[in-house]
Amino acid sequence: MDQPAGLQVDYIFRGVEHAVRVVVSGQVLELEVEDRMTADQWRGEFDANFIEDLTHKTGNFKQFSIFCNMLESALTQSSESVTLDLLTYTDLESLRSRKLGGRPGALAPRSAQLNSKRYLILIYSVEFDRIHYPLPLPYQGKPDPVVLQGIIRSLKEELGHLRGLNGGQDARETEIWHLREQVTRLTSEKRELEAQLGRSREEALAGRAARQEAESLRGLVRGLELELRQERGLGGRAAGRRSQDSRRLAKELEEVKASERNLRARLKTLNSELAMYRRGRRTLPPVAVREGRASSSRERSTSRGRAVTRSSSRESSRGARGRGRPAHPSPSPTGSRAPRFDPTAFVKAKEKKQREIRMKQQQQQRNRMGSGGSGDGPSVSWSQQTRPAAAVTGRGDAVNRSRNRSSSVDSFRSRCSSVSSCSELEDFSHSVSRSRRCRGRGKPPSPTPWSRSKTKSTTQERSDHQRHLASSGGWVPIKEYSSDFQGADMAEIDARLKALQEYMNRLDTRS
């Protein structure tokens, strides 16, 4: 293995700087240590046998070449497992005794040579052990001034010789020096230009990124402008639709308000009519039949003389029928006002009253027939006079009702009033015809062409009048107006009144 020719390093031992020089020539190791402060020198030469024998005594044998490498590593401090230390003889004895474990005894008197000797210790540290290799270095004293002066002179001569040899190269060296300075300057400029180029590249990249960002922002702005135009168009159309909807809703609101006012007015009218119906169900004092007939004749003359509204004619006809009826208890079980108007009960009570009136009229007719036949002429004439008047009155009431009718409820009530008034005339004429048949058994009248033609015309006129009233929504005789149809109509009236009341409650809640 090739060994270095020589090595010199500065090493600090125990806080003092020393210069250590190592020279390996073949199988000989030359070692020299010099104190930088005092210029004292210690020098020693060791062959390969001495080194190997020393390592063998320590118990960790090393070859000469390996030992030299370890010494070199310790000087250059390239390995942490080997270090150096410089000890005196006293330090070495104390270290040896501490290693052997004995007490430090009294030291024997030492010579000056031992005191001046130094020991260079190569310390090899392993995992669980430390091995010391001591190398003794005899004291060489201080350098000789004569020798030093000779060395100085030889160095000066060598320097002059080198300068003489290089005298012709001074200009070249100067030029090289200038070129080196120029290279140094250009190198610094190159570094500056590289730095500037790097900054320029960064700026260019930043500018490119800025341009890309600007382009993306422009595209985003264009997209937003397009969306804005679309939204404006949609907003305009939506605003138009909303304005149309608002106008339509305002119109519907006005219509609803108008219908609400109409319904409130109708509800008020129906409430008043209901109150009148409830008042009509109360018990009234008995009145003579003659007064009832007079009032009915006055009512017929009034209806023939002028046009009367539907409500007033209905009230007057109810008042006339109420005065002409005999006194009967009210159909109400308690006699007080009912909490709710029941049209079915009202119709049943009305039919019951009509049957009672019919029976009363038949009884009066029997009594009149039993007392004598003097009343036949007036009764027949009265019936002949009453029927056209009743027909005229029924027509006028039907026309007036058809003009003032606003709903199916009012139409049905007007038909019920017409049925009640006309059924009385029909019953009365029926009783008169029966009395005629009874008189015909004892003394049949002689038929005349005038009476025959008048009877045919009266019958035909009555049938035509009934068909006309039935088609125009007027009264229909009780025989033709069945109880099943009455019950269906009354159920329809109940349903419509209930729906109207619920609608008015919803309107009140909404408002």
From Swiss-Prot:
Modified residues (Phosphoserine): 330, 332, 371, 374, 446, 472
Statement: the UniProt record of this protein carries the keyword Acetylation: yes
Regions that span the bilayer: none
Segments for region (Head domain): 1-143
Composition bias type Basic residues, residue spans: 433-442
Biased composition (Basic and acidic residues): 290-302
Residue positions, PTM N-acetylmethionine: 1
Top-level division of the source organism's lineage: Eukaryota
UniProt feature, compositional bias: Low complexity: 360-369
GO cellular component, one term: centriolar satellite
InterPro entries tied to this protein: CCDC61_N
Family in the record: Belongs to the CCDC61 family.
Protein name listed in UniProt: Centrosomal protein CCDC61
Misc: The N-terminal 3D structure (head domain) resembles that of NHEJ1/XLF, PAXX, SASS6 and XRCC4.
Modified residues (Phosphothreonine): 283
Gene source species: Mus musculus
Compartments it resides in: Cytoplasm, Cytoskeleton, Microtubule organizing center, Centrosome; Cytoplasm, Cytoskeleton, Microtubule organizing center, Centrosome, Centriolar satellite; Cytoplasm, Cytoskeleton, Cilium basal body
PANTHER family, per database record: CENTROSOMAL PROTEIN CCDC61, YEAST SPT2-RELATED
Domain notes: The coiled-coil domains are involved in microtubule-binding.
Function field: Microtubule-binding centrosomal protein required for centriole cohesion, independently of the centrosome-associated protein/CEP250 and rootletin/CROCC linker. In interphase, required for anchoring microtubule at the mother centriole subdistal appendages and for centrosome positioning. During mitosis, may be involved in spindle assembly and chromatin alignment by regulating the organization of spindle microtubules into a symmetrical structure. Plays a non-essential role in ciliogenesis.
Extent of Polar residues compositional bias: 449-458
GO biological process, one term: cell projection organization
Keywords: Acetylation, Cell projection, Cilium biogenesis/degradation, Coiled coil, Cytoplasm, Cytoskeleton, Phosphoprotein
Taxonomic lineage of the native organism: Eukaryota, Metazoa, Chordata, Craniata, Vertebrata
Region of interest (Disordered), residue spans: 284-413, 429-476
Molecular function (Gene Ontology), one example: microtubule binding
